[in-house]
Amino acid sequence: MKITKRLLLAVIMLAITVVIPFILPQNHILFGKMLQPMHTPVLLSAYIVGAPLAAVIGAVAPVIRHRWVGMPTLEIAIPMCFELATYGLVTGIVYKISSHRGRSIVKSLLAGMLAGRVVWGIVNVVMHNYTFGMIMAEGFGNAFPGIVLQMFLVPLIIYGLKKIHKIK
């Protein structure tokens, strides 16, 4: 894919990442933490535009959204920047390395999500003195519906795009 097309797609994915939380009801605690509306477009970006651009999208989207509407709050946005950048980077790299094998979409998705959660936990330990229990409860327990949604939705969308030959 030409760089111009990749950059255009990256800008579109960034816009989707920033705007998609508006689609959900405005209860950010319930829907923001549980369904993780900014996470899914970043994961999709890893497959569509590649690891480096997906990492940039993940790193800047929470800050753009914070500056635009004040949500997520800065205390949440900073760890999210690291988490989403890791999502994009690791998912894209693992997919590229293993794309010649079967199940590479699911494998790269799991690797990216796990790496992103680990980075998110480390940043929250440093910034907010989170304990292991807090990381497990907030990072995996509260986010479980979003994780399930991403595990279903991301492969479905990517397989669909591959089928209509929009991505490799």
Task: State where each predicted segment sits.
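Loop-helix junctions at membrane interfaces
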Residues: M1-K168
